[in-house]
């Protein structure tokens, strides 16, 4: 059984037991979080596709931890002007473990 749900403007395909990195959620480590924006639920031969959401669909997950991703380096450069600017960015994420999927 797997599901596709939406969180933080992104869609994630998950199954029970999977660990997923999502955009940062303001939830403490160890707590459970429910996602009700489920777009698709598949169970063997049965597939429930939402229009746009599956009615009564829910994905339950436990927060494993929070962290920051790899550094992305940004360079702004202006030719012939002796000007360059270098910046870095590390995006916050929340890691969750999927515990239940229900239609």
Swiss-Prot record:
GO molecular function, one term: rRNA binding
Gene Ontology BP term (one): translation
InterPro entries xrefs: bL21-like, bL21-like_sf, Ribosomal_bL21, Ribosomal_bL21_CS
Function of the molecule: This protein binds to 23S rRNA in the presence of protein L20.
Entry similarity comment: Belongs to the bacterial ribosomal protein bL21 family.
Subunit and interaction comment: Part of the 50S ribosomal subunit. Contacts protein L20.
Protein name as annotated: Large ribosomal subunit protein bL21
Species, as recorded: Shewanella frigidimarina (strain NCIMB 400)
């Amino acid at each position: 059984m797997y599901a596709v749900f939406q969180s933080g403007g992104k869609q994630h395909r998950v199954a029970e037991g999977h660990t997923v990195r999502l955009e940062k959620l303001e939830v403490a480590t160890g707590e459970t979080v429910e996602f009700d924006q489920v777009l698709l639920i598949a169970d063997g031969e049965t597939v429930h596709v939402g229009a746009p959401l599956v009615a009564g669909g829910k994905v339950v997950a436990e927060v494993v931890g929070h962290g920051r991703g790899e550094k992305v380096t940004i360079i702004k450069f202006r030719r012939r002007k002796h000007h360059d600017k270098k910046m870095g960015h590390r995006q916050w994420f929340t890691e969750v473990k999927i515990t239940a999927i229900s239609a």
